[in-house]
């Protein structure tokens, strides 16, 4: 009789169960360490299918997020699949399998691109696309394919309109995507005439941050700019339900639910009418201990500090350019540069650079998946 080995629960509530993969995955060849590297799983290049560097960079970042990869490698996604929209999620699972358990230095994302292109034809064209927009489409489609319905119960003991508003469930649909990436902003809106305050919730998977300087600033500067109080006047006035007319208002945002993995979009592309330009500001961002305490509502400060786990870089201008990715591997704990099929290990000091476009931060360090011996 064989004994069942218990698996440790990780900080995300998802088991690291690479050792318990299905028989199909067991038949796939696994990359062997060459002696100089502890392991090369998850360090695989992606072929460029014609201006698809934006897609490759995003896929490498998602491939570096262990709890997401484990969810697909374990086969858990199969039981959650919605039959009418399973093609993208299934193609994503096969691609993650090739990138983690295959024996090739690089693989082709053609099947995944084709599946997503059936829904969004723009991604099948050999033209450059925006990596942030592509990321949002991918996360949305994975959520739609894997969502389950949840019916929340009322909390009768809560007092205060702000607290009640913050504690409402974000959505009745949950998935591995919402569990990992979805956060919630809470806006306090004060009418400057009657001084009454109302609250509004807004979910997010990516936070788009303004860049307050043209030359140099920090990620904290971008966060402070995003979360500072804003006064809406003239054409931007908001309807006040108490005054029953549009009024000048003061609006301030806070994070009422911090996601386990928070993604920042640095708004480098400035488009005003027919004028387009790229902000080449050198933005300094920490690799560890990003403190979000000032921006999280006090009663929801469960994950105040974050560590960087992946970066999407953009070179060039708005009408062209090239995307690459920096990702931290959960096996080796080393950083790697992914430039389509070209993969190389880089020192921590190289992760900070002036071309960063998307930043992926995790509230907990990723655990090393259990390997089958």
From Swiss-Prot:
One GO MF term: cysteine-type deubiquitinase activity
Main location: cytoplasm
One Pfam family in the UniProt entry: UCH
One cellular-component annotation, GO: cytoplasm
Keyword Secreted appears in the UniProt entry: no
Compartmental location: Cytoplasm; Cytoplasm, Cytoskeleton, Microtubule organizing center, Centrosome; Nucleus
Catalytic reactions of this protein: Thiol-dependent hydrolysis of ester, thioester, amide, peptide and isopeptide bonds formed by the C-terminal Gly of ubiquitin (a 76-residue protein attached to proteins as an intracellular targeting signal)
Keywords: Cell cycle, Cytoplasm, Cytoskeleton, Hydrolase, Nucleus, Protease, Thiol protease, Ubl conjugation pathway
Any one of the GO BP annotations: regulation of cell cycle G2/M phase transition
Keyword Hydrolase in record: yes
EC code(s) of this entry: 3.4.19.12
Major enzyme class: hydrolase
USP domain mapped to chain residues: 44-364
PROSITE patterns, sorted: USP_1 (PS00972), USP_2 (PS00973), USP_3 (PS50235)
UniProt-annotated catalytic positions: 53 (nucleophile), 322 (proton acceptor)
Other remarks on this protein: The human ortholog is inactive.
Protein family membership: Belongs to the peptidase C19 family.
Function as written in the Swiss-Prot or TrEMBL entry: Deubiquitinating enzyme that removes conjugated ubiquitin from specific proteins to regulate different cellular processes. Regulates the inflammasome signaling pathway by deubiquitinating 'Lys-63'-linked polyubiquitination of the PYCARD/ASC adapter protein. Regulates the ubiquitination and stability of the ACE2 protein. Acts as a negative regulator of the G2/M checkpoint pathway, by preventing serine/threonine kinase WEE1 degradation, thereby repressing entry into mitosis following activation of the G2/M DNA damage checkpoint.
Protein name in UniProt: Ubiquitin carboxyl-terminal hydrolase 50
Organism of origin: Macaca fascicularis (Crab-eating macaque)
Gene field: USP50
